[in-house]
């Protein structure tokens, strides 16, 4: 809770006038407890998970749009029915309500312990961006090793096989997993803010962006505007789709966000081999088409 009764008091304490964003934040949060602000994450989680995958649900369910976007689908021969996608949504929401939501409600002491602040001044844009970069890097590295653990025989058979029920993943399948796996993978998500604690707004953004990134990675589509085209070492849907395509025996593409861990530790060799093979086949196909067209033109 902000320890100022009025905007004037806040301005005096900061020795400057509040920015319009700080004024907006003051008006919204001044009378709300830090616990209440922290619990906003539950609402953000439910809304993002429910709404962000909807465009792709529409694309998959509609024949006209499905044909239009089929060239961007990574596994074009696999069609997910509306009923299967809705079942996935219901199963994940059940897990959110019974496991993730209650955990959020009781985990506030950890936020107090690492000193996530909610007062003024607000962090600068550069501070927010720098912290988010740290969070993504820390999450990616630690998630990589947790994910590798889940692909050992015991971890896969006991827990991770549930997540791999979708060999052609969809957005709603991003958090579709055993409840124990969801809890364990929450550690990499929390570790970044624990190492570099910031403002509650930064924490909100982190949870939201991480959820959106996971949904995009499991979308099953590689669009021209996908982030992998613009962010170096970003894996994206095409990269992670290979991991699901190979299935339970996959020892490749473990990283959650970036590709550098798989490259450093040699767990992307199968993926790179497949990419190279597909590229060679594509080039041969082009050459064959040129020869055929050339022959027809010569006649």
From Swiss-Prot:
Alphabetized, the UniProt keywords read: Endoplasmic reticulum, Iron, Lipid biosynthesis, Lipid metabolism, Membrane, Monooxygenase, Oxidoreductase, Steroid biosynthesis, Steroid metabolism, Sterol biosynthesis, Sterol metabolism, Transmembrane, Transmembrane helix
GO MF annotations, alphabetized: C-4 methylsterol oxidase activity; iron ion binding
Q: Which GO terms describe its biological process?
A: 4,4-dimethyl-9beta,19-cyclopropylsterol oxidation; fatty acid homeostasis; sterol biosynthetic process; sterol homeostasis
Membrane topology label:
Multi-pass membrane protein
Coiled-coil residues: none
Q: What cellular component terms from Gene Ontology apply here?
A: endoplasmic reticulum; endoplasmic reticulum membrane
Q: In what residue span(s) does the Fatty acid hydroxylase domain sit?
A: 132-267
- Where can this protein be found? Endoplasmic reticulum membrane
For whether the record's keyword set contains Glycosyltransferase, the answer is no
Q: What is its EC number?
A: 1.14.18.10, 1.14.18.9
Motif mapping: Histidine box-3: 239-245
Q: Which tissues carry this protein?
A: Expressed in embryo sacs, pollen and trichomes. Observed in leaves, roots, siliques and flowers.
Q: Catalytic activity, per the record?
A: 4,4-dimethyl-5alpha-cholest-7-en-3beta-ol + 6 Fe(II)-[cytochrome b5] + 3 O2 + 5 H(+) = 4alpha-carboxy-4beta-methyl-5alpha-cholest-7-ene-3beta-ol + 6 Fe(III)-[cytochrome b5] + 4 H2O; 24-methylenecycloartanol + 6 Fe(II)-[cytochrome b5] + 3 O2 + 5 H(+) = 4alpha-carboxy-4beta,14alpha-dimethyl-9beta,19-cyclo-5alpha-ergost-24(24(1))-en-3beta-ol + 6 Fe(III)-[cytochrome b5] + 4 H2O
Tell me which cofactor or cofactors this protein depends on.
Fe cation
- Principal location: endoplasmic reticulum
Q: List the InterPro entries.
A: Fatty_acid_hydroxylase, Sterol_Desaturase_Related
Q: Where is this motif: Histidine box-1?
A: 147-151
Q: What class of enzyme is it?
A: oxidoreductase
Q: What is known of its domains?
A: The histidine box domains may contain the active site and/or be involved in metal ion binding.
Q: What else is known?
A: Requires a membrane-bound cytochrome b5 as an obligatory electron carrier from NAD(P)H to SMO.
Q: So what family is this one in?
A: Belongs to the sterol desaturase family.
Q: How does it assemble?
A: Interacts with ACBP1.
By what name is this protein known? Methylsterol monooxygenase 1-2
| Underlying gene | SMO1-2
């Amino acid at each position: 809770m902000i320890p100022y009764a009025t905007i004037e008091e806040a301005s005096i304490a900061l020795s400057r006038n509040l920015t319009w964003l700080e004024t907006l934040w003051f008006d919204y949060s001044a009378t709300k407890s830090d616990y209440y602000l922290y619990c906003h994450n539950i609402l953000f989680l439910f809304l993002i998970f429910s709404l962000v995958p909807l465009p792709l649900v529409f694309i998959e369910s509609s024949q006209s749009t499905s044909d239009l976007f089929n060239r961007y689908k990574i596994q074009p021969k696999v069609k997910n029915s509306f009923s299967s996608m809705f079942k996935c949504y219901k199963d994940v929401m059940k897990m959110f309500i019974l496991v993730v939501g209650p955990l959020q409600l009781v985990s506030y002491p950890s936020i107090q312990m690492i000193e996530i602040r909610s007062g003024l001044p607000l962090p600068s844009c550069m501070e927010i961006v720098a912290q988010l970069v740290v969070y993504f890097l820390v999450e990616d590295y630690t998630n990589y090793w947790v994910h590798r653990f889940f692909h050992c025989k015991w971890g896969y058979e006991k827990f991770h096989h549930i997540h791999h029920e979708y060999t052609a993943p969809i957005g709603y399948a991003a958090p579709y997993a055993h409840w124990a796996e969801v809890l364990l993978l929450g550690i990499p998500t929390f570790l970044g803010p624990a190492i570099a604690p910031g403002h509650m707004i930064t924490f909100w953004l982190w949870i939201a962006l991480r959820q959106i990134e996971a949904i995009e990675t499991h979308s099953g589509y590689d669009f021209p505007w996908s982030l992998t085209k613009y962010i170096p070492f970003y894996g994206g849907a095409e990269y992670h789709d290979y991991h699901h395509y190979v299935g339970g025996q996959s020892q490749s593409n473990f990283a959650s966000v970036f590709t550098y861990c798989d490259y450093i530790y040699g767990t992307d060799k199968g993926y790179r081999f497949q990419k190279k093979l597909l590229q060679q086949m594509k080039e041969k196909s082009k050459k064959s088409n040129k020869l055929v067209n050339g022959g027809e033109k010569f006649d």
